[in-house]
From Swiss-Prot:
Its cofactor is Zn(2+); Co(2+). One of its GO terms (molecular function) is succinyl-diaminopimelate desuccinylase activity. Its EC number is 3.5.1.18. Transmembrane segments: none annotated. The lineage of its organism: Bacteria, Pseudomonadati, Pseudomonadota, Alphaproteobacteria, Rhodobacterales. The gene is dapE1. This is Succinyl-diaminopimelate desuccinylase 1. It comes from the Bacteria. Pfam families: M20_dimer, Peptidase_M20.
Amino acid sequence: MTTTDPVQLTADLVRCPSVTPTEGGALVLLERLLTDAGFSCTRVDRGEVCNLFARWGDKAHARTFGFNGHTDVVPIGDEAAWTHDPFGAEIVEGVMYGRGTTDMKSGVAAFAAAAIDFVQDTPPDGAVVLTITGDEEGDAVDGTTALLDYMDAAGEKMSVCLVGEPTCPNHMGEMIKIGRRGSMTAWFTVTGVQGHSAYPHRANNPMNGLARLMDRLGSHQLDEGSEHFDASTLAIVTIDTGNPATNVIPAQGRAAVNIRFNDLHSGASLTDWLQGEADKVAKEFGLEVDMKVQISGESFITPPGDLSDLVSRAVQTETNQAPELSTTGGTSDARFVKSHCPVVEFGLVGKTMHQVDENVDVAHIHQLKSIYSRILKDYFS
């Protein structure tokens, strides 16, 4: 019986300094491991980003279980603030420390270990695919999207996909993500007429219009939530003039808002609403208001059904806890996968991700491998 140690693999990956978009040796390590286990591996590098596609079994099989994860990590920040080497994978009293221990080298290691053992011990009638990117924490332009583009061009398929992001807020097994809110940011530049603050009638203060616009946006209730989502939110994230002089009315003011939106909206519909509000303020104050928008991802939902039931049963069997089906939190690469096949997310407890002394309970890594192993077994049974 094959036994691939997910803790050792996690440690090996953590010791690869793969701060996005640097590959750092992590994908090289995975490619070698998976190739030795009989997987067909293809590097799908695009731009400055390295990605790995790995498949065991027949290409485009009708029953192909897919996994998506990333080996890139966020910067460590001030290394002096760390108690443990951020790339040392030190284990102290059953806890492993290091950047990526939670987000999400442990998830990648747990699934890789589960998949290797599963296909070698009980070869299924089907295929197992891993799509591992080095561009999830960065711009996410040449990562999972590049892998999906490659799959489309090569005729590769996933019937379903599990994303291994840390989904549990506090306790192992408590939450599965079946969807995500959309995310977009809008930047506003309001241009008026500069002047002396003692003679405001000779100027046109852009800050008056900018303040009105931010008040209109910030006080507006986008919705009250939907069946599977909480209410959409709009946060004012910056207001700036770049003006240090208190006796000068500035010529320009700038602000930005970030919107996390549910399935009652789209990036396009919200862009139209924002533009309409900007136009009203421009007309009211006689100002020029320019807007630039970036839509990071649309909201999506994989309705509760076969895939979420499959994962829920495995989680409950291994943890004795019935997981909540949730759409909370930020964006993930599931927003790209959802256009390819049904997708859900399940992984470890994410309390320390991106923090100094990021860490994971090593027992949870073993438990996650057991959950992933059961998911594979049940999917192909």
